[in-house]
Each structure stands twice: as structure tokens, then as C-alpha cells.
Design a protein with these regions (language model features):
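Glycine-rich N-terminal segment of FAD-binding domains in flavoprotein oxidoreductases
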Residues: 1-34
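FAD-binding subdomain of flavoenzyme oxidoreductases
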Residues: 36-182
Length: 182
């Protein structure tokens, strides 16, 4: 911080906005070794995971324990939890489980001065959560997060439908959501 040297966290490198393109005086932090699912709290339906964990690996580990995060961005195979948080990501099942900002209950961040901050929803430093979620890593490096999880569904079925017009397709989506179907 004293030398104004940029620090850029590097998760899986799937971002398309150029956020991980360092200049010659940049410190690049490779997050790949921070890739563990640390804890599942079955009673509270939460899990603690490292920010460098690839999304599909997180989902696979949760599924093996009977749970799901329910977050399925198109980049799930090549993006990290920290990247999802930094990018404020949404996924294909956001209508059912919410976006990443709805799932993050707490996180640890190292800010630009090197301070380690813990923010918990409804607790200490809660006001920091909306600042860091979607900040693209500008304000600090997310190191881990506590996430809301759900019991894994007994089965998943996917289908596609063709509608005669955009309007009828949008009307069908509206009726599905109003009926509470997800």
C-alpha cells in the first residue's frame, strides 16, 4: 500500500474484462492453492470454502454430502468462488437459489493495507459485504466465504421449449415464476 503497487488476485482466469491483466509493477496473487471446502454445517445449512475453489469442484463436494450451492454460472467449470464473489455472479438456477450475493453469509477479505477483515451478514462488519461483493477485487482479496447451501434435490431434469414468439415465451416464464415453480 505504501508504494502504491497494484495487487491482483488470480483465480481461474476465466474473466473476460481484462481484470487480471497485470502491468509490469503488479503483484499477481495466484489463488489456486486455496481450494478447500473447509466445513459443512448440516444444521445451519452453511458451508465454509476457500476463494480459490473451482465452482464445479465445490458443487461436486457439496453433492457428495447431499447438498447443493445451487449456483451454476456458465463458467462453473473454469471459475472460482472468489471470482464469483468479485464479479457478483448469477447462474442458471438463480431464480430458485438466488445469486451469489444472496448465498454469501460471510467472508474474509485482505484489504489494500494488508488488514484481514471478517464480514458476517447480520453481524460484525456486515456493511462490508455489499461493498466487496461485485468489487472485482479492487477493494481487497477475498480469501474464503461462508455460504448458504440447500439440500440437493433428489433428481434434476432439464428441458427446453420452443414458443411461437418472444412474448409468449416471456409470458410462460412469468407464469412459471408466479406459480412458484423453479
Amino acid at each position: 500500500a505504501a508504494r502504491s503497487i497494484p495487487v491482483v488476485p488470480y483465480g481461474a482466469g476465466s474473466g473476460v474484462c481484462g481484470g487480471v491483466l497485470p502491468t509490469t509493477d503488479t503483484v499477481l496473487i495466484d489463488m489456486k492453492m486455496m481450494r478447500q471446502l473447509r466445513h459443512i454445517d448440516r444444521a445451519r445449512l452453511t458451508c465454509d470454502a476457500d476463494a480459490g475453489m473451482i465452482g464445479q469442484h465445490l458443487e461436486d463436494d457439496l453433492n457428495a454430502a447431499g447438498f447443493t450451492l445451487g449456483h451454476f454460472p456458465s463458467s462453473i467449470y473454469c471459475s472460482t468462488l472468489g471470482g464469483w464473489i468479485a464479479g457478483r455472479s448469477a447462474g442458471q438456477c438463480s431464480g430458485r437459489y438466488g445469486k451469489i450475493e444472496d448465498m454469501v453469509l460471510g467472508m474474509t477479505v485482505v484489504d489494500g493495507t494488508g488488514r484481514v477483515l471478517r464480514a458476517e451478514r447480520g453481524g460484525e462488519n456486515a456493511a462490508l459485504l455489499p461493498l466487496f461483493i461485485g468489487s472485482e477485487g479492487i477493494l481487497g482479496v477475498v480469501t474464503d466465504a461462508r455460504l448458504r447451501i440447500a439440500p440437493a434435490p433428489p433428481c434434476r431434469r432439464f428441458a427446453s421449449y420452443l414458443f411461437p414468439s418472444t412474448e409468449t415465451g416471456l409470458d410462460a416464464i412469468r407464469r412459471i415464476f408466479q406459480a412458484g415453480l423453479r
